[in-house]
Amino acid sequence: MEYRIERDTMGEVRVPADKYWGAQTQRSLENFRIGTDRFRMPLEIIRAYGMLKKAAARANLELGELPEEIAKAIIQAAEEVVQGKWDDHFPLVVFQTGSGTQTNMNVNEVIANRASEILGKPLGSKYVHPNDHVNRGQSSNDTFPTAMYVAVALALHQRLYPAVEGLIRTFTAKAQAFDQIVKVGRTHLMDAVPITLGQEIGSWAAQLKTTLAAVKEMEKGLYNLAIGGTAVGTGLNAHPRFGELVAKYLAEETGLPFRVAENRFAALAAHDELVNVMGAIRTLAGALMKIGNDVRWLASGPYAGIGEITIPANEPGSSIMPGKVNPTQVEALTMVVVRVYGNDHTVAFAGSQGNFQLNVYKPVMAYSTLESINLLADAVASFDAHLAQGIEPNLERIEEHLQKNPMLATALNKAIGYDKAAEIVKKALKEKKTLKQAALELGYLTEEEFDRIVVPMRLAKPHEGA
């Protein structure tokens, strides 16, 4: 491998000749060999940083803080970072300084060297300087949280929201299709009064809508950016209008209403907005756990379980039991949920660890949140495509359970009273008879009266037509 010499304030460093990074990135590579292959800084952060550095160069150009030639080269190089052209030039891990300084400098060095190259200058020449030009008016302390918020907001819009909204559409369609299928309701894991299969699946769609709306509400906090606060929130070394312009340009590029945080001291010292978003994502994940559990119970069997719905058989379920079909998509989804719960704890605890003017757990907060978004998006899309869209009713089993359901007697309360209805249920269960047989033998109702009162669909939709 060929090397070139890069320099920083600590001296000379050998850097691979074909890489755009510089001395500080190389030092970080050598000093933080922690999870190198498994915990790389997410590319979402790198791309967001590219947007930020482009916006910063535009702002500095407008404010007369950078020469036009330098600014335009930075803008071009930063756009190449956004497009993913230099992804393999960002090798650093999450576990570095808690302010994300090494990643900020990795981005600064790559853009500076690429911009210098665009202007016909050799790598390492610092014709475009990583600190004086690319990082002008900035600190790692305000740029990393800015890139973090931009990255998470974009990941929500590009990954999580479409996946969950797709599953909501699937459940809504299934709810409409199965609206006339009456089945046993269940509370406390015990038989209860009837509902329709459509009502049951419709409740899943409603729960997802509610929890997704909460994520979207919490996302609004991410629009408040730390940029312009520089090292401690005072804005030292930044033009007074710099942060405002950067936020404006980021809003233009992303289509999201980014703005400068009202209090940039708080924006550096705490990241409660991200903690709130992650908490809402965890709540959404909890809804998916509930739905997944419902699905696997309803599909359990085929003979010794509930078996009221069927799900697609995507692959053999067992290496020893021939013909077995397992709810594998549910199991994958719920394992992701467990991971998200762990990540939420990481983000919540990390968010509590700000000291004075800076929280120094930013990279792990960013990584954990982005991992949760990406895992959930993938798992929900997989669950939707390979399971939810293939849910079908097992009409024979549904009817069998419905006819045996003693809770149909609830419909008799108004006609004969709670006590007599309970007596009918006890007799039916003890003597293994239908409710109708028990009611007739006790003489509390005629056959005509029973048939008129105990209508399962009317129990499931008592107010329809009212």
UniProtKB/Swiss-Prot annotation:
Substrate binds at residues 99-101, 129-132, 139-141, 187, 319, 324-326. PROSITE patterns: FUMARATE_LYASES. Keywords: Cytoplasm, Lyase, Tricarboxylic acid cycle. It catalyses: (S)-malate = fumarate + H2O. Its main location: cytoplasm. Involved in the TCA cycle. Catalyzes the stereospecific interconversion of fumarate to L-malate. This is Fumarate hydratase class II. It comes from Thermus thermophilus (strain ATCC BAA-163 / DSM 7039 / HB27). The lineage of its organism: Bacteria, Thermotogati, Deinococcota, Deinococci, Thermales.
